[in-house]
């Protein structure tokens, strides 16, 4: 049996008298791939925010990478989680190069400042862009990309730190059928690697 990457025990979220999520009980082990399906308003985004350690539940215990929320430095923990979704996408600087959008994830920041990146960082960023078919866009300005190209860059960024848990929030939203199929095919090839992180895809 693999190492437990994530566990929720009697987790729920309330807004006033209304329960918007839960109660939930489940766990994910290393190497597993999960898909969370549901209509709008079902609580998928709330769940993802909890899993990404960006929201605390009203009740219950959440453990991420063997660390219990409320008893750990969340900033340090977040460096071990890859997140691709609208929360991150909205804050990516449009005037940044594609390569820098991916590279800055190594410091868990958005936007290039005065960080030093070594050859390993550069090589990993370009390898990820290659995996998702956008290597040739490395020097392009992020804001000039199509929606499909941006999605591929965002997934590459989420994987830059070699995370132990990968969270994808509707990664194919806004793409046409061909773009959706191509992105999911590339991700399926990546996820087939036994060394790929435990993954939750919300759609």
Model-derived features: where do they sit?
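Conserved catalytic motifs of ABC-family nucleotide-binding domains
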Residues: 162
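Conserved structural motif at the start of ABC-family nucleotide-binding domains
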Residues: 6, 20-23, 138
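Helix-to-loop junction immediately C-terminal to a conserved catalytic motif
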Residues: 52
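The feature captures the beta-strand-to-loop junction immediately N-terminal to the Walker
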Residues: 37-39
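Catalytic Walker B motif of ABC-type/P-loop ATPase nucleotide-binding domains
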Residues: 166-170
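Conserved ABC ATPase signature
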Residues: 116, 141-145
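Conserved ABC transporter NBD signature motif
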Residues: 60-70, 77
């Amino acid at each position: 049996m693999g190492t437990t990457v994530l566990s929720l025990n009697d987790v729920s979220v309330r807004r006033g008298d209304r329960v918007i999520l839960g109660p939930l009980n489940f766990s994910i082990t290393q190497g597993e791939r999960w898909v969370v399906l549901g209509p709008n308003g079902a609580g998928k985004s709330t769940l993802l925010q909890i899993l990404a350690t960006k929201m605390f539940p009203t009740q219950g215990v959440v453990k991420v990478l063997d660390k219990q929320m409320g008893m750990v430095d969340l900033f340090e923990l977040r460096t071990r989680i890859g997140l691709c979704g609208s929360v991150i996408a909205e804050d990516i600087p449009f005037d940044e190069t594609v390569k820098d959008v991916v590279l800055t994830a190594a410091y868990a920041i958005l936007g290039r400042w005065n960080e030093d990146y070594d050859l390993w960082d550069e090589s990993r960023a370009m390898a990820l862009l290659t995996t998702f078919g956008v290597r040739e866009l490395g020097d392009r300005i992020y804001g000039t990309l199509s929606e499909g190209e941006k999605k591929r860059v965002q997934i590459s960024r989420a994987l830059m730190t070699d995370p132990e848990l990968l969270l994808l929030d509707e990664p194919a939203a806004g793409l046409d059928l061909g773009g959706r199929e191509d992105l999911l095919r590339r991700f399926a090839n990546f996820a087939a690697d036994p060394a790929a992180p435990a993954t939750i895809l919300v759609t």
